[in-house]
Protein backbone atom coordinates (compact mmCIF):
# COMPACT_ATOMS: atom_id res chain seq x y z
CA UNK A 1 0.00 0.00 0.00
CA UNK A 2 1.52 3.35 -1.06
CA UNK A 3 2.18 5.77 1.76
CA UNK A 4 0.02 8.89 1.79
CA UNK A 5 1.75 12.23 1.48
CA UNK A 6 1.82 13.44 5.08
CA UNK A 7 -0.72 16.14 5.87
CA UNK A 8 -1.72 17.54 9.21
CA UNK A 9 -4.95 16.01 10.42
CA UNK A 10 -7.78 17.42 12.53
CA UNK A 11 -10.84 15.56 13.83
CA UNK A 12 -13.91 17.77 14.19
CA UNK A 13 -17.02 16.62 16.08
CA UNK A 14 -20.23 18.16 14.74
CA UNK A 15 -20.61 18.43 10.96
CA UNK A 16 -23.33 21.08 11.20
CA UNK A 17 -23.19 24.62 9.85
CA UNK A 18 -20.64 25.96 12.36
CA UNK A 19 -18.46 22.87 11.95
CA UNK A 20 -18.45 22.94 8.14
CA UNK A 21 -18.64 26.71 7.67
CA UNK A 22 -16.39 28.06 10.39
CA UNK A 23 -14.07 25.58 12.13
CA UNK A 24 -13.40 23.20 9.21
CA UNK A 25 -12.91 26.18 6.89
CA UNK A 26 -10.10 27.52 9.12
CA UNK A 27 -8.53 24.07 9.44
CA UNK A 28 -8.71 23.50 5.68
CA UNK A 29 -7.12 26.90 4.98
CA UNK A 30 -4.30 25.97 7.38
CA UNK A 31 -3.42 22.77 5.53
CA UNK A 32 -5.25 20.18 7.64
CA UNK A 33 -7.14 17.19 6.36
CA UNK A 34 -10.44 17.40 8.26
CA UNK A 35 -12.18 14.29 9.59
CA UNK A 36 -15.80 15.12 10.45
CA UNK A 37 -17.43 13.00 13.18
CA UNK A 38 -21.21 13.08 13.54
CA UNK A 39 -24.18 10.82 14.33
CA UNK A 40 -26.30 12.11 11.43
CA UNK A 41 -25.96 9.31 8.86
CA UNK A 42 -27.46 11.35 5.99
CA UNK A 43 -25.00 14.19 6.61
CA UNK A 44 -22.02 11.79 6.84
CA UNK A 45 -23.06 10.06 3.60
CA UNK A 46 -23.52 13.41 1.82
CA UNK A 47 -20.05 14.59 2.89
CA UNK A 48 -18.41 11.35 1.79
CA UNK A 49 -20.26 11.46 -1.55
CA UNK A 50 -19.15 15.02 -2.35
CA UNK A 51 -15.48 16.00 -2.89
CA UNK A 52 -16.17 19.62 -1.93
CA UNK A 53 -18.65 22.16 -0.60
CA UNK A 54 -18.81 25.95 -0.60
CA UNK A 55 -18.62 28.48 2.23
CA UNK A 56 -20.38 31.74 1.31
CA UNK A 57 -19.53 34.83 3.36
CA UNK A 58 -22.16 37.58 3.20
CA UNK A 59 -21.77 41.20 4.16
CA UNK A 60 -22.95 44.66 3.22
CA UNK A 61 -20.23 44.83 0.55
CA UNK A 62 -21.31 41.62 -1.20
CA UNK A 63 -20.51 37.91 -0.99
CA UNK A 64 -17.34 35.83 -1.19
CA UNK A 65 -17.20 32.11 -1.88
CA UNK A 66 -14.51 29.59 -0.96
CA UNK A 67 -14.36 25.86 -1.68
CA UNK A 68 -13.56 23.30 1.03
CA UNK A 69 -11.89 20.02 0.01
CA UNK A 70 -9.61 17.38 1.59
CA UNK A 71 -12.08 16.03 4.16
CA UNK A 72 -13.64 12.74 5.16
CA UNK A 73 -16.58 11.95 7.43
CA UNK A 74 -17.10 9.18 10.00
CA UNK A 75 -20.33 8.09 11.69
CA UNK A 76 -19.31 8.21 15.35
CA UNK A 77 -22.23 5.98 16.34
CA UNK A 78 -21.45 3.07 14.00
CA UNK A 79 -17.71 3.44 13.26
CA UNK A 80 -16.21 4.10 16.67
CA UNK A 81 -13.06 2.01 16.11
CA UNK A 82 -12.12 3.95 12.97
CA UNK A 83 -12.74 7.24 14.78
CA UNK A 84 -10.57 6.21 17.77
CA UNK A 85 -7.68 5.52 15.40
CA UNK A 86 -8.09 8.91 13.69
CA UNK A 87 -8.04 10.72 17.07
CA UNK A 88 -4.97 8.70 18.12
CA UNK A 89 -3.04 10.08 15.13
CA UNK A 90 -4.50 13.61 14.79
CA UNK A 91 -2.78 16.88 15.63
CA UNK A 92 -5.99 18.63 16.62
CA UNK A 93 -9.46 17.65 17.92
CA UNK A 94 -12.17 20.32 17.79
CA UNK A 95 -15.93 20.26 18.33
CA UNK A 96 -19.06 22.34 17.76
CA UNK A 97 -21.78 20.06 19.08
CA UNK A 98 -23.48 22.23 21.71
CA UNK A 99 -22.48 22.32 25.39
CA UNK A 100 -25.06 19.67 26.33
CA UNK A 101 -23.51 17.09 23.96
CA UNK A 102 -19.92 17.28 25.28
CA UNK A 103 -20.50 14.38 27.68
CA UNK A 104 -21.54 12.14 24.77
CA UNK A 105 -18.42 12.76 22.65
CA UNK A 106 -16.00 12.47 25.60
CA UNK A 107 -15.78 8.62 25.75
CA UNK A 108 -14.53 8.19 22.17
CA UNK A 109 -12.08 11.11 22.49
CA UNK A 110 -10.79 9.53 25.72
CA UNK A 111 -10.18 6.23 23.91
CA UNK A 112 -8.38 8.00 21.07
CA UNK A 113 -6.11 9.92 23.46
CA UNK A 114 -5.43 6.76 25.47
CA UNK A 115 -4.31 4.93 22.31
CA UNK A 116 -1.96 7.73 21.29
CA UNK A 117 1.70 6.78 20.77
CA UNK A 118 4.20 8.41 23.11
CA UNK A 119 6.30 9.23 20.02
CA UNK A 120 3.66 11.74 18.88
CA UNK A 121 3.33 15.25 20.28
CA UNK A 122 0.21 15.85 22.43
CA UNK A 123 -3.05 16.34 20.57
CA UNK A 124 -4.58 19.81 20.98
CA UNK A 125 -8.24 19.61 22.08
CA UNK A 126 -10.26 22.80 21.52
CA UNK A 127 -14.03 22.99 22.12
CA UNK A 128 -15.68 25.66 19.97
CA UNK A 129 -18.91 26.20 21.89
CA UNK A 130 -20.96 29.15 23.12
CA UNK A 131 -20.13 28.48 26.76
CA UNK A 132 -17.53 29.63 29.25
CA UNK A 133 -14.82 27.00 29.85
CA UNK A 134 -16.28 24.46 27.41
CA UNK A 135 -12.92 22.74 26.85
CA UNK A 136 -12.46 22.42 30.63
CA UNK A 137 -15.91 20.80 30.80
CA UNK A 138 -15.00 18.39 27.99
CA UNK A 139 -11.66 17.58 29.69
CA UNK A 140 -13.48 16.74 32.94
CA UNK A 141 -15.71 14.27 31.08
CA UNK A 142 -12.71 12.77 29.24
CA UNK A 143 -10.73 12.33 32.49
CA UNK A 144 -13.71 10.88 34.36
CA UNK A 145 -12.83 7.37 35.64
CA UNK A 146 -15.69 5.98 33.50
CA UNK A 147 -13.78 7.15 30.40
CA UNK A 148 -10.11 7.13 31.42
CA UNK A 149 -8.71 4.78 34.12
CA UNK A 150 -7.10 6.87 36.86
CA UNK A 151 -3.65 5.25 36.40
CA UNK A 152 -3.68 6.49 32.76
CA UNK A 153 -3.93 10.12 33.90
CA UNK A 154 -0.24 10.14 34.88
CA UNK A 155 1.74 12.32 32.43
CA UNK A 156 -1.54 12.96 30.58
CA UNK A 157 -0.19 16.26 29.22
CA UNK A 158 2.21 14.18 27.08
CA UNK A 159 -0.81 12.84 25.20
CA UNK A 160 -3.25 15.79 25.19
CA UNK A 161 -3.47 19.52 25.87
CA UNK A 162 -6.85 21.19 26.48
CA UNK A 163 -7.33 24.82 25.46
CA UNK A 164 -10.46 26.89 26.08
CA UNK A 165 -11.64 29.12 23.27
CA UNK A 166 -14.09 31.89 22.42
CA UNK A 167 -15.70 31.78 18.99
CA UNK A 168 -17.77 34.49 17.40
CA UNK A 169 -19.45 34.21 14.04
CA UNK A 170 -23.14 34.41 13.15
CA UNK A 171 -24.27 31.38 11.16
CA UNK A 172 -27.98 31.77 10.35
CA UNK A 173 -30.46 29.09 9.34
CA UNK A 174 -29.56 27.91 5.85
CA UNK A 175 -31.63 27.88 2.66
CA UNK A 176 -33.62 24.66 2.25
CA UNK A 177 -31.75 23.78 -0.96
CA UNK A 178 -28.26 24.67 0.34
CA UNK A 179 -27.09 21.07 0.66
CA UNK A 180 -23.62 21.04 2.23
CA UNK A 181 -22.91 24.69 1.39
CA UNK A 182 -22.88 27.12 4.32
CA UNK A 183 -23.77 30.81 4.34
CA UNK A 184 -22.40 32.94 7.19
CA UNK A 185 -21.32 36.47 8.03
CA UNK A 186 -17.89 37.76 6.99
CA UNK A 187 -16.90 38.82 10.52
CA UNK A 188 -15.26 36.22 12.75
CA UNK A 189 -13.28 35.97 15.96
CA UNK A 190 -11.62 32.80 17.26
CA UNK A 191 -9.58 33.37 20.42
CA UNK A 192 -7.80 30.45 22.11
CA UNK A 193 -5.91 30.11 25.40
CA UNK A 194 -2.18 29.78 24.68
CA UNK A 195 -1.14 28.77 28.22
CA UNK A 196 -1.56 24.96 27.79
CA UNK A 197 1.17 25.15 25.10
CA UNK A 198 3.85 27.00 27.12
CA UNK A 199 6.49 24.32 26.43
CA UNK A 200 5.55 23.68 22.80
CA UNK A 201 4.18 25.47 19.76
CA UNK A 202 0.39 25.70 19.62
CA UNK A 203 -1.27 24.22 16.53
CA UNK A 204 -0.65 26.21 13.37
CA UNK A 205 -4.20 27.37 12.56
CA UNK A 206 -4.50 30.60 10.59
CA UNK A 207 -7.06 33.01 12.01
CA UNK A 208 -6.77 31.98 15.67
CA UNK A 209 -5.81 34.75 18.09
CA UNK A 210 -3.74 33.05 20.83
CA UNK A 211 -3.95 34.85 24.21
CA UNK A 212 -2.69 34.28 27.76
CA UNK A 213 -5.90 35.45 29.48
CA UNK A 214 -9.02 34.24 27.72
CA UNK A 215 -11.76 35.17 30.22
CA UNK A 216 -12.16 38.84 29.14
CA UNK A 217 -12.62 37.71 25.51
CA UNK A 218 -15.12 34.98 26.42
CA UNK A 219 -17.21 37.20 28.70
CA UNK A 220 -17.09 40.19 26.36
CA UNK A 221 -18.29 38.00 23.50
CA UNK A 222 -20.94 36.02 25.45
CA UNK A 223 -22.29 39.07 27.30
CA UNK A 224 -22.36 41.28 24.19
CA UNK A 225 -22.95 39.17 21.06
CA UNK A 226 -25.03 36.40 22.63
CA UNK A 227 -26.82 38.66 25.11
CA UNK A 228 -27.66 41.16 22.36
CA UNK A 229 -28.70 38.53 19.82
CA UNK A 230 -30.94 36.67 22.29
CA UNK A 231 -32.45 39.89 23.70
CA UNK A 232 -33.50 40.92 20.19
CA UNK A 233 -34.86 37.42 19.47
CA UNK A 234 -36.93 36.99 22.65
CA UNK A 235 -38.40 40.50 22.56
CA UNK A 236 -38.99 39.99 18.83
CA UNK A 237 -40.73 36.65 19.34
CA UNK A 238 -43.14 38.10 21.90
CA UNK A 239 -43.88 41.00 19.53
CA UNK A 240 -44.42 38.57 16.63
CA UNK A 241 -41.42 39.62 14.54
CA UNK A 242 -40.15 36.99 12.11
CA UNK A 243 -36.38 37.68 12.03
CA UNK A 244 -33.80 39.37 14.23
CA UNK A 245 -33.40 41.98 11.49
CA UNK A 246 -37.17 42.71 11.65
CA UNK A 247 -37.01 42.90 15.44
CA UNK A 248 -34.22 45.46 15.34
CA UNK A 249 -36.20 47.71 12.99
CA UNK A 250 -38.59 48.19 15.94
CA UNK A 251 -37.40 51.18 17.99
CA UNK A 252 -38.69 49.68 21.28
CA UNK A 253 -36.77 46.43 20.77
CA UNK A 254 -33.70 48.35 19.65
CA UNK A 255 -33.88 50.27 22.93
CA UNK A 256 -34.22 47.02 24.96
CA UNK A 257 -31.09 45.62 23.29
CA UNK A 258 -29.21 48.88 23.88
CA UNK A 259 -30.15 48.89 27.58
CA UNK A 260 -29.23 45.21 28.08
CA UNK A 261 -25.81 45.88 26.53
CA UNK A 262 -25.37 48.95 28.74
CA UNK A 263 -25.90 46.62 31.72
CA UNK A 264 -23.32 44.10 30.48
CA UNK A 265 -20.86 46.78 29.30
CA UNK A 266 -20.71 48.15 32.84
CA UNK A 267 -19.70 44.70 34.10
CA UNK A 268 -17.19 44.06 31.29
CA UNK A 269 -15.38 47.39 31.64
CA UNK A 270 -15.26 47.30 35.46
CA UNK A 271 -14.31 43.63 35.80
CA UNK A 272 -11.76 43.31 33.00
CA UNK A 273 -10.40 46.85 32.74
CA UNK A 274 -11.57 47.16 29.14
CA UNK A 275 -11.65 50.77 27.96
CA UNK A 276 -15.21 52.18 27.98
CA UNK A 277 -14.87 53.74 24.53
CA UNK A 278 -13.47 50.49 23.10
CA UNK A 279 -16.40 48.55 24.60
CA UNK A 280 -18.87 51.14 23.25
CA UNK A 281 -17.42 50.71 19.75
CA UNK A 282 -17.53 46.92 20.15
CA UNK A 283 -21.24 47.13 21.10
CA UNK A 284 -21.99 49.37 18.09
CA UNK A 285 -20.26 46.86 15.79
CA UNK A 286 -22.18 43.94 17.33
CA UNK A 287 -25.55 45.69 16.91
CA UNK A 288 -24.67 46.34 13.25
CA UNK A 289 -23.74 42.68 12.82
CA UNK A 290 -26.92 41.23 14.32
CA UNK A 291 -28.91 43.77 12.25
CA UNK A 292 -27.43 42.38 9.00
CA UNK A 293 -30.37 42.03 6.54
CA UNK A 294 -28.39 39.42 4.56
CA UNK A 295 -28.52 37.03 7.54
CA UNK A 296 -32.21 36.16 7.61
CA UNK A 297 -32.19 34.72 11.10
CA UNK A 298 -35.57 33.61 12.47
CA UNK A 299 -36.27 34.68 16.06
CA UNK A 300 -37.29 31.08 16.84
CA UNK A 301 -33.84 29.81 15.80
CA UNK A 302 -31.93 32.42 17.81
CA UNK A 303 -34.22 31.91 20.83
CA UNK A 304 -34.15 28.11 20.83
CA UNK A 305 -32.93 26.24 23.93
CA UNK A 306 -34.25 28.76 26.50
CA UNK A 307 -33.38 26.49 29.47
CA UNK A 308 -29.69 26.63 28.55
CA UNK A 309 -29.85 30.35 27.81
CA UNK A 310 -31.48 31.05 31.20
CA UNK A 311 -28.89 28.98 33.09
CA UNK A 312 -26.45 30.29 35.70
CA UNK A 313 -23.37 31.01 33.59
CA UNK A 314 -25.21 32.10 30.48
CA UNK A 315 -25.94 35.39 28.71
CA UNK A 316 -28.61 36.85 31.06
CA UNK A 317 -28.25 35.34 34.54
CA UNK A 318 -24.43 35.23 34.46
CA UNK A 319 -23.88 39.00 34.10
CA UNK A 320 -27.05 39.95 36.03
CA UNK A 321 -25.93 37.93 39.08
CA UNK A 322 -22.56 39.69 39.20
CA UNK A 323 -24.13 43.13 38.71
CA UNK A 324 -26.73 42.48 41.43
CA UNK A 325 -24.05 41.38 43.92
CA UNK A 326 -22.38 44.78 43.46
CA UNK A 327 -25.66 46.71 43.64
CA UNK A 328 -25.51 47.66 39.95
CA UNK A 329 -28.37 47.95 37.47
CA UNK A 330 -29.38 44.71 35.73
CA UNK A 331 -33.01 45.62 34.96
CA UNK A 332 -32.74 45.28 31.17
CA UNK A 333 -31.17 41.82 31.55
CA UNK A 334 -34.11 40.85 33.78
CA UNK A 335 -36.52 42.17 31.12
CA UNK A 336 -34.78 40.01 28.49
CA UNK A 337 -34.85 37.00 30.85
CA UNK A 338 -38.60 37.56 31.30
CA UNK A 339 -39.09 37.33 27.53
CA UNK A 340 -37.01 34.12 27.54
CA UNK A 341 -39.28 32.67 30.26
CA UNK A 342 -42.22 33.46 27.94
CA UNK A 343 -40.59 31.50 25.08
CA UNK A 344 -42.71 28.38 25.65
CA UNK A 345 -44.04 25.56 23.45
CA UNK A 346 -42.29 26.87 20.36
CA UNK A 347 -42.59 24.43 17.47
CA UNK A 348 -39.44 22.36 16.95
CA UNK A 349 -37.82 23.39 20.25
CA UNK A 350 -37.91 20.73 22.97
CA UNK A 351 -36.49 23.00 25.68
CA UNK A 352 -39.32 25.51 25.22
CA UNK A 353 -41.83 22.69 25.82
CA UNK A 354 -39.88 21.56 28.89
CA UNK A 355 -39.79 25.17 30.14
CA UNK A 356 -43.59 25.36 29.82
CA UNK A 357 -43.94 22.21 31.97
CA UNK A 358 -41.55 23.54 34.62
CA UNK A 359 -43.36 26.90 34.75
CA UNK A 360 -46.78 25.21 35.02
CA UNK A 361 -45.90 22.84 37.84
CA UNK A 362 -43.44 24.62 40.18
CA UNK A 363 -43.40 27.48 42.66
CA UNK A 364 -41.49 30.56 41.41
CA UNK A 365 -38.63 29.98 43.86
CA UNK A 366 -38.21 26.40 42.65
CA UNK A 367 -38.27 27.50 39.00
CA UNK A 368 -35.45 29.97 39.69
CA UNK A 369 -33.38 27.32 41.48
CA UNK A 370 -33.97 24.68 38.81
CA UNK A 371 -33.73 26.78 35.64
CA UNK A 372 -31.31 29.54 36.65
CA UNK A 373 -29.18 27.71 39.20
CA UNK A 374 -29.47 30.61 41.66
CA UNK A 375 -29.70 30.17 45.43
CA UNK A 376 -31.64 32.24 47.96
CA UNK A 377 -28.49 33.93 49.30
CA UNK A 378 -27.75 35.61 45.96
CA UNK A 379 -29.03 39.16 45.54
CA UNK A 380 -30.41 38.37 42.09
CA UNK A 381 -32.61 35.54 43.42
CA UNK A 382 -35.66 37.61 44.57
CA UNK A 383 -35.51 39.73 41.40
CA UNK A 384 -35.80 36.66 39.16
CA UNK A 385 -38.53 35.22 41.42
CA UNK A 386 -40.55 38.39 40.67
CA UNK A 387 -40.01 37.87 36.94
CA UNK A 388 -41.22 34.25 37.15
CA UNK A 389 -44.25 35.29 39.25
CA UNK A 390 -45.22 37.79 36.55
CA UNK A 391 -44.94 35.25 33.75
CA UNK A 392 -46.85 32.60 35.72
CA UNK A 393 -49.62 35.09 36.59
CA UNK A 394 -50.06 35.93 32.89
CA UNK A 395 -50.21 32.25 31.99
CA UNK A 396 -52.92 31.67 34.61
CA UNK A 397 -54.90 34.60 33.18
CA UNK A 398 -54.85 33.18 29.64
Curated annotation (Swiss-Prot):
NAD(+) binds at residues 10-21. The active site is at 221. InterPro entries: 6-PGluconate_DH-like_C_sf, 6PGD_dom2, Mannitol_1_phos_5_DH, Mannitol_DH, Mannitol_DH_C, Mannitol_DH_N, NAD(P)-bd_dom_sf. GO terms for molecular function: mannitol-1-phosphate 5-dehydrogenase activity. One of its GO terms (biological process) is mannitol catabolic process. It catalyses: D-mannitol 1-phosphate + NAD(+) = beta-D-fructose 6-phosphate + NADH + H(+). The keyword Oxidoreductase applies. Its EC number is 1.1.1.17. Keywords: NAD, Oxidoreductase. It holds the Pfam family Mannitol_dh. One of its GO terms (cellular component) is cytosol. Catalyzes the NAD(H)-dependent interconversion of D-fructose 6-phosphate and D-mannitol 1-phosphate in the mannitol metabolic pathway. Belongs to the mannitol dehydrogenase family. Monomer. This is Mannitol-1-phosphate 5-dehydrogenase. It comes from Neurospora crassa (strain ATCC 24698 / 74-OR23-1A / CBS 708.71 / DSM 1257 / FGSC 987).
Amino acid sequence: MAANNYTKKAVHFGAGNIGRGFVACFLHNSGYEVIFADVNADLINALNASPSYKVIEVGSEGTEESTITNYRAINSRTNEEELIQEIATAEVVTCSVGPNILKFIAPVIAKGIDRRSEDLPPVAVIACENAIGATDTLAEYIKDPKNTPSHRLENYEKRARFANSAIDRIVPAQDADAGLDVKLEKFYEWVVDRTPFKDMSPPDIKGINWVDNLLPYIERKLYTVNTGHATAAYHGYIRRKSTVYDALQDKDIQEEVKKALENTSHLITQKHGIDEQAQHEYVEKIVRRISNPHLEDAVERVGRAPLRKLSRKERFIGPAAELAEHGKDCSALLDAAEMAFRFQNVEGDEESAELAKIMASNKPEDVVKQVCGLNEQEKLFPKVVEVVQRVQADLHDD
